[in-house]
UniProtKB/Swiss-Prot annotation:
Name of this protein: Queuine tRNA-ribosyltransferase
GO cellular component term of the entry, any: cytosol
Region of interest (RNA binding), residue spans: 250-256, 274-278
Binding locations of substrate: D95, S96, G97, G98, F99, D149, Q192, G219
The protein's annotated pathway: tRNA modification; tRNA-queuosine biosynthesis
Lineage: Bacteria, Bacillati, Bacillota, Bacilli, Lactobacillales
Record PANTHER family: QUEUINE TRNA-RIBOSYLTRANSFERASE (PTHR46499:SF1)
Organism: Latilactobacillus sakei subsp. sakei (strain 23K) (Lactobacillus sakei subsp. sakei)
GO molecular function: metal ion binding; tRNA-guanosine(34) queuine transglycosylase activity
GO terms (BP aspect): queuosine biosynthetic process; tRNA wobble guanine modification; tRNA-guanine transglycosylation
Superkingdom classification of source: Bacteria
Enzyme kind, highest EC tier: transferase
Length: 380
């Protein structure tokens, strides 16, 4: 049986671990490395599907936990799956719900069977197991699905993380058995292990032995420093097969994207660009710009003079500041669109740099202009 997800390696960058590739899904092909906008509840906040296509998004992420609780996977399935439900004909990836259960849910109780917890919406008692998570993801119909895993805190004890990794491997195997649609939905395994190299190796070895069509790196961007994250990536990505995609979960700051690519990561997602946009904060080639600040009230330049998105072509900082201060939703739409475009376009620039074997030079120039080399509060 042909796998639902195929990865083709196009080129390796000469001086780093970066890879140029493409991923084929049942709903189209996209080039990697790439950034995925997050549509938590089957919608990227304030964005129409047409906006996402216009900015070049090839795949978006939705959250299994939220859609399971509301509207329910049965309703999405009756609609014909997420693609039809939200009128999106490109790729969709769903997480397993595990991260939300471990971070949002109250009074969770972890056992070998799964996790008992209370809904963050109404306090209802619920239970999520590897089989249930896969059942929900099968019903949602995403092109790429995630295994149900435990995401332990980064600074948890070695003994706890070891037990957690072993349980995550057992859960991954149970999820594979429960998976009903391997020909149309690709299920990824998630490598855990916090900051411990031997536990990351154990996790990777277990999962690679199960022959998933792709692998996620979980348990990062959860409070550790960027240096710690890069240290873990340095030893984790080489443990993963070269002929499968590698996905770093929950990472979306420009520096972390570039540094992740340098270490061999192909896919990223994060709520960061839309979350900060709702607070009037934007990413520009010159670093962070908080457009809601008073100093922009008479600034009639675009958010980023170097950006060619439709927001920067048509609207000024002063106008966008006015909208944000007046609580107009259109202002949040404009900042969200720009931030998503900025990251998707950044990944296109990174792809070009890999093609030209000058990714390290690109990183140096980008970091200098963005302000990452100074402690000036402009960066993320």
């Amino acid at each position: 049986m042909e796998p639902a997800i195929k990865y083709r390696l196009i080129k390796k960058e000469k001086h780093t671990g970066a890879r140029l590739g493409e991923i084929v899904t049942p709903h189209g092909t996209f080039k990697t490395p790439m950034f995925m906008p997050v549509g938590t509840q089957a919608s990227v906040k304030t964005m129409a599907p047409e906006d996402l296509k216009e900015m070049g998004a090839g795949i978006i992420l939705s959250n299994t936990y939220h859609l399971w609780l509301r509207p329910g996977e049965d309703i999405v399935e009756k609609a014909g799956g997420l693609h039809k439900f939200m009128n999106w004909d490109r790729g969709v990836l769903t997480d397993s719900g595990g991260f939300q259960v471990f971070s949002l849910a109250k009074l969770r109780d972890i056992s070998e069977e799964g996790v008992a917890f209370k809904s963050h919406l109404n306090g209802e008692k619920l239970f999520l197991s590897p089989e249930k998570a896969i059942h929900v993801e099968n019903a949602l119909g995403a092109d790429i699905m995630m295994s149900f895993d435990e995401c332990p805190p980064f600074f948890e004890s070695y003994d706890y993380v070891k037990k957690s990794v072993e349980r995550t491997s057992r859960w991954a195997e149970r999820g594979l058995i429960a998976h009903q649609n391997p020909a149309t939905q690709g299920l990824f395994g998630i490598v855990q292990g916090a900051g411990f190299e031997d536990l990351r190796r154990q996790s990777a070895r277990d999962l690679v032995g199960m022959d998933f069509p792709g692998y996620s790196i979980g348990g990062l961007s959860v409070g550790e420093s960027k240096g710690e994250m890069n240290r873990v990536l340095d030893f984790t990505t080489p443990m993963l097969p070269e002929d499968k995609p590698r996905y770093l979960m929950g990472v979306g700051s420009p520096d972390a994207l570039i540094d992740g690519v340098i270490r061999g990561v192909d896919m990223f997602d994060c709520v960061l660009p839309t979350r900060i946009a709702r607070n009037g904060t934007t990413m520009t080639s010159q670093g962070r710009l908080v457009v809601k600040n008073a100093k922009y009230s008479e600034d009639f330049r675009p958010l980023d003079p170097k950006c060619d998105c439709y927001v920067c072509k048509n609207y000024t900082r002063a106008y966008i500041r006015h909208l944000i201060k007046a609580d107009e939703t259109f202002g949040i739409h404009l900042t969200s669109y720009h931030n998503l475009y900025f990251l998707i376009n950044l990944m296109h620039q990174v792809q070009d740099a890999i093609e030209q074997d000058n990714l390290l030079e690109f990183r140096e120039a980008f970091f200098e202009e963005y302000g990452y080399n100074e402690n000036n509060g402009r960066n993320f």
